[in-house]
Amino acid sequence: MRSLEHFAAENAKSARAFLSAVGMPRPLQQIEIVEIASAKAELLKPLRQGHSLGVVSEAGCPAIADPGAAVIEAAHREGFRVVPLVGPSSIVLALMASGLEGQRFAFCGYLPRGGAERKKRIGELERRSQREKQTEIFIETPYRNDVLLAALVEACNPGTRLCVAADLTLPSESVQTKPIAEWRRAKAAIGRRPAVFLLQATA
């Protein structure tokens, strides 16, 4: 990554701050950052000109529940080589620390915002988890964390296990896995922290 001169990012300002923090060897003025949403026609221009192009995520792992996926798709469509770089993924880290089923799991992205639709989707995921004996993984925008947690605690069976992994890789990191019945008694709140939710229904 340190050798790249061209990047695609959701936000150029925060991408420059990140590149500065990781100590890019070349001056930031020499680095071109194209914003993914505003310049789709220009995204692959560096690749077409023979340069490499890096994808920087605003938060989390590039292209996983992230707008960067559009860049990767376009690169494959035009036949360019795609090379994933080693880095943390909150989804995998949360699963590693959860104690839930790690052989069979599914990442479901964001659940519906509407109360009735969300409740229906939670029921579907809980039933699928029980049927397939797998862990269901999903995320939420931080300011809606506590709404989702309350919906899970209300909708799920008492024996279903729920893990909430918040602030992963930070000093304030918290990973808690317990049955829904215990979450109900605890009346816990996550607050506006980046969090991953993992659910495993009992047989």
Regions found by a protein language model. Give the residues of each.
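Hydrophobic side chains in well-ordered alpha-helices
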Residues: F18, R121, L148-L149
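Class I SAM-dependent methyltransferase SAM-binding "motif I" and its flanking Rossmann-like core
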Residues: P25, D66, A70-R128
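Short hydrophobic/aromatic-enriched beta-strand-loop microsegments
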Residues: R26-E35, V82, G102-G109, P158-A165
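A contiguous loop/helix-start segment that scaffolds small-molecule binding in enzyme catalytic cores
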Residues: E32-V34, R48-S52, R131-A203
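Conserved phosphate/pyrophosphate-binding and hydrolysis machinery centered on Walker-type P-loop NTPases
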Residues: C61, A65, L111, G115, ...
